[in-house]
Amino acid sequence: MMTSLPRRFCIALALVIMIGLHGESLRAGEDSDLELIPDHILSQSAPETQPEAASAEKPYRLKIFLDETGQGNFERRSLVVPTPSEDFSRWNNRISLDVRTEVTLSPTFNFTFADRLSHILEEHMAPSEENLRNDLKEIYFTWNAYGSDYIDLGRVNVKNGVAMGFNPTDYFKRYAVTTRISEDASVLRENRLGTFMIRGQGVWEKGALMLVAAPEISHEPDKWWTDSSGSGLQVQRTNDVTRFLAKFNVNTFQDLNPEILYFIEDGRSNWGLNLTKGLGDQVVAYVESSIGQRADVLTEALQKVQASGAFPLSTFPAGTPATITGSDEIRLRSQMAAGFSYTDKGNRTTNIEYHYNEAGLSPEQWDNWFRAGAQGKIFLDNPATEATGRNMLGQLWSVRQFAQEAEEPLSRHVLFIRSFWQDALIYKLDLTGIFQMNLEDKSFFIQPLAAYHLGDRTTLSLAFNFFLGAGQSEYGSLPQLWNVRAGIQYFF
């Protein structure tokens, strides 16, 4: 299977280029009016900087802002499953300079660049070069090959999916978030590393086609392109395997927009579907699903961590036996996010969703997780078995770390609600509320957030995050009970 990947990559590359070279055949009799391009295509690709628009505007768009955020963390007093390390950080601070520019180089060529430079401090962290992190989020060239056909080459943040809290078809999201600046999935998807790829897009009156080929790049450790200390490209996060994506959008039905995706990762196939349906002027129903070949979360987490020889909070010798095991069978497993959005006349939009992850932990696996954690705690309290206890607990907490970095639910059944109120109560005050519940153990996460815009350049924000539930539950077992985050953004 793996030996055929170079051939597959060459075929995919040829297909991507053909979109640009043979676009006219894709749109026999097409009206080239740009209003026919679906909004979700424009929002994620270079067509935003089209030559027609650029001729009446500046040849570039530049956005620069400074973000200063401080966070206070409040520890849960008693943990059923302790972490391997007792270095709980009670505070952290991040100041970031974020730059994004889109430049029209010629009538047919554009250049896009997005970068974030951050200085991060937290309790127990000694000042060093590791406090400084640079994330090159996007850098790519766009060729307007013909009419509404585009080819992108470089690091691109490809975003897929119609849901708000969990996107099963957002196939390039895994490990792409380097700094968790928010618990809001819609914010994280805009602030992550792109993937090095070549992407071709063709848009016509009744639909759109996108092809992506993303090669595996050597992820030998401690190289400038893999350095994870803050100065490298971190391609081990975004290009660790060869991946292909084909996406076809149909725009022929009134108020019904189907989108079909086919994705190959490391030789394994996945099929995805996005479907939206307008129900009147205020309600949009949607479903997003994916089915593909994979092991479960437990197995994938332990395989990944054992291969690297590192846990999120401790280090263990290679070959350490797994404290807990999942189903290592590679078979078809499905994920889904289904729900609706409701927008009222008072600038309030509420999304209610059900999330399903077949690869997530079942109630029985959660019981095994807590049972193994109790045993690890006993070993940790005994000096003779302390090292073993740390390794056991490290394996257990690596599962939590993996699910967070993979941006997928750790449990199988989740309820998600997000409400956004623009100009709430007073002008320029925006309120956001997020509620997420594990439907099996009834533990939940809740986040109220307020953002006040001081003119056009400055925004003040205040957010609280609460992780609540019984001691032996998903959210009730986390080290953090709650935290508060205050920030200020200044746009130049």
Protein language model features and the residues they cover:
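Residues on the lipid-exposed face of transmembrane beta-strands in outer-membrane beta-barrel proteins
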Residues: 95-103, 138-143, 198-202, 246-250, ...
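Outer-membrane beta-barrel "beta-signal"
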Residues: 177, 415-417, 478-492
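Residues that define the transmembrane beta-barrel architecture of outer-membrane proteins
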Residues: 89-95, 132-137, 192-196, 203, ...
